[in-house]
A protein has these predicted regions:
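Alpha-helical transmembrane segments of integral membrane proteins
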Residues: 4-298
């Protein structure tokens, strides 16, 4: 899309927003703005990281220590993007209508699903994931769709899809304002422990899944691991960033508590990320050592 088209679209959407704001006393358009921000903030953060990753594309693999430092740095940058977007959402919804729940934030489940979909699109435009090429035009997109829908599928792919589908069901089902997938007992115990030991209990999906995966994604790219591994880690990393933004959509929670909750999750997530990188490095070293021994014995 050209810059001229982007400007026309921007002014058109802005004008339409003003009209809707006047006609609905601001409630509907505020909900739309908040939902759009909750979706675009994590996507913008991930696109910014992708652009940073591309600066090292074509370069030689970096050392493990430098890659770990960059992984930690980029996690903090993404978290800052998420915090800015989250506080913007809190400012949009910070009025009596939403505090008294005469109006509600709508689309909580979309804030978890759409960022992942949009990041997939952004990734395909920037990295040669599909058959060693990127997708940057309508023709390439059509070719991708045709090839994807007509490719040969092995039986194990169905098991992988089933596992991913179960993970998505749990992930989405436990979001929103209504009860969905029940929380297991061991997780309730973990939550109570975190509530008793930390200023604000961080979200498990942030410090257990999202943040460590995002750090490992940066590490994987800097060390020139296979693109498919980097892609999967990037998608897992979106979960943590999107969760940080969604925290600010809970209007009953003071903004300061949301900030501290994100900070605590970032702190533990960064620690887990470093430990995960060390563990993966150790496993790779052990694997290489055993392979070298087998070669020597032969």
């Amino acid at each position: 899309m050209s810059k001229h088209t982007q400007l026309v679209a921007f002014f058109g959407i802005s004008l339409a927003s003003i009209v809707v704001f006047i006609l609905t006393s601001g409630t509907l358009i505020t909900q739309i703005w908040a939902l759009s921000s909750a979706i675009m903030a994590p996507v913008g953060a991930m696109i910014r990281l992708m652009e940073e990753w591309r600066r090292y594309d074509g370069a030689r693999p970096l050392g493990a220590i430098k890659s770990t430092i960059l992984a930690l740095l980029y996690l903090v940058i993404a978290a800052l993007f998420a915090a800015i977007g989250g506080m913007y959402i809190a400012s949009l919804l910070g009025n009596t209508k939403f505090f008294m729940e005469f109006a509600l934030f709508r689309g909580v489940k979309l804030t978890f699903v759409l960022p992942i979909i949009l990041v997939i699109i952004a990734y395909l435009q920037r990295f040669p994931l599909w058959n060693g090429r990127m997708i940057n035009s309508k023709e390439e997109a059509k070719t991708f769709v045709v090839e994807f829908l007509t490719m040969d599928v092995k039986l194990y792919v169905f098991f992988i899809i089933a596992a991913l589908g179960g993970a998505v069901w749990v992930f989405v089902g436990r979001s929103g304002h209504t009860a969905g997938v029940p929380v297991p007992g061991f997780e309730l115990m973990l939550r109570r422990f975190l509530e008793n030991t930390m200023y604000a209990r961080p979200r498990e999906k942030e410090f257990i899944i999202g943040h460590p995966a995002l750090m490992l994604a940066t590490f994987a790219f800097m060390r020139k691991w296979p693109t498919v591994i980097h892609f999967l880690l990037t998608l897992a990393g979106v979960i943590g960033i999107a969760s940080m933004v969604e925290t600010f959509c809970h209007l009953r929670t003071p903004v300061f508590m949301s900030i501290m909750r994100g900070y605590d999750g970032l702190l533990i997530g960064a620690l887990f990320g470093v430990l995960l990188i060390i563990a993966v490095r150790f496993m790779m070293y052990v694997t290489q050592w055993f392979q070298a021994r087998e070669v020597d014995h032969e």
